[in-house]
Swiss-Prot record:
Enzymatic reactions: (S)-2,3,4,5-tetrahydrodipicolinate + NAD(+) + H2O = (2S,4S)-4-hydroxy-2,3,4,5-tetrahydrodipicolinate + NADH + H(+); (S)-2,3,4,5-tetrahydrodipicolinate + NADP(+) + H2O = (2S,4S)-4-hydroxy-2,3,4,5-tetrahydrodipicolinate + NADPH + H(+)
Pathway per the UniProt entry: Amino-acid biosynthesis; L-lysine biosynthesis via DAP pathway; (S)-tetrahydrodipicolinate from L-aspartate: step 4/4
Residues bound to NAD(+): G11, A12, S13, G14, R15, M16, E37, G101, T102, T103, A125, G126, N127, M128
UniProt-annotated location(s): Cytoplasm
Pfam hit, one: DapB_N
Protein name stated in the entry: 4-hydroxy-tetrahydrodipicolinate reductase
Organism: Cereibacter sphaeroides (strain ATCC 17023 / DSM 158 / JCM 6121 / CCUG 31486 / LMG 2827 / NBRC 12203 / NCIMB 8253 / ATH 2.4.1.)
Presence of keyword Cytoplasm: yes
Length: 269
């Protein structure tokens, strides 16, 4: 068992953090060696398993990420942008693979991740599921095949607690559509519409976001032309798909050269 890669989960008390820890513990492919929470969290100092309402697992939740990362081969991180860039720098110091599922990252955050990737492996994706990554590849292929007579819209739905929009997955799909079209998403993107907007701009890629209830994640990519429409859709019903994908990425990253990778690399797509 000690030969299995050691994994640290950040944001341990969150829904994804707990799902990630449970997935690692049940996998038989890795060991949970650390759980990180913010200073002041009532989880700090408790056994991670007991804090989740189960049996003790021998891992104490800590607010010292570097100490945790130093004993790990990989860090899985679904937290917030500012925390993620700090974790990236610490994971690079520890030479641990850093798997990032955090969304809402801005250009300044990405610059700091690029620095960290000179020293360690970073696997970052807006979505870790196999299905969504296949959808991303399909979106690019369809966008390549269709001309600008086909309008492209990305519609996503998530639970009421999600704080960023459009989702990281929606942006990933939009980037795929833009690549297929040979355009810059920053120039083509239209996010939401309200009031008198005028006719749709040719070649634009639209985004719409829905927030409500406990929706895990739904994404539609719509290609609409006069008289016909194609919809590519992915529906997530269980967060475990993201946790399984993240663990797969953490294992894949072992012994890779430092650099930035994504789930397409992990899945060989």
């Amino acid at each position: 068992m000690s030969d299995l890669p050691g994994i640290v989960v950040t944001g341990a008390s969150g829904r994804m953090g707990q799902m990630l820890m449970k997935t690692v513990l049940a996998s038989g492919k890795a060991r949970l060696v650390g759980a990180v929470e913010r200073p002041g969290s009532d989880w700090v100092g408790r056994d991670a398993g007991a804090a989740m309402g189960g049996a003790a697992v021998g891992v104490t939740v800590t607010d010292d990420p570097l100490a945790a990362f130093a004993q790990a081969q990989a860090v899985i991180d679904f937290t917030a942008p500012e925390a993620t860039v700090q974790f990236a720098e610490l994971a690079a110091q520890a030479r641990a693979v850093h798997v990032i599922g955090t969304t809402g990252l801005e250009p300044a955050h990405l610059e700091r991740l690029a620095w960290a990737a000179h020293h360690a492996v970073i696997v970052r994706a807006g979505n870790m599921s196999l299905g969504v990554n296949l959808l991303t590849r399909l979106t690019q292929k369809v966008a390549e095949a269709l001309d600008e007579d086909w309008d492209i819209e990305v519609v996503e739905a998530h639970h009421r607690m999600k704080v960023d929009a459009p989702s990281g997955t929606a942006l990933m799909l939009g980037e795929a559509a833009a690549r297929g079209r040979g355009v810059d998403l920053a120039q083509a993107r239209v996010s939401g519409r309200d009031g008198i907007t005028g006719p749709r701009a040719p070649g634009s890629i639209g985004f719409s976001a829905i927030r409500g209830g406990d929706i895990v994640g739904e994404h539609d990519v719509i290609f609409a032309a006069a008289g016909e429409r194609i919809t590519l859709r992915h529906v997530a019903t269980d967060r475990a798909i993201f946790a399984r994908g993240a663990l797969k990425a953490a294992l894949w990253g072992q012994d890779r050269r430092p650099g930035q990778y994504d789930m397409m690399d992990v899945l060989g797509l």
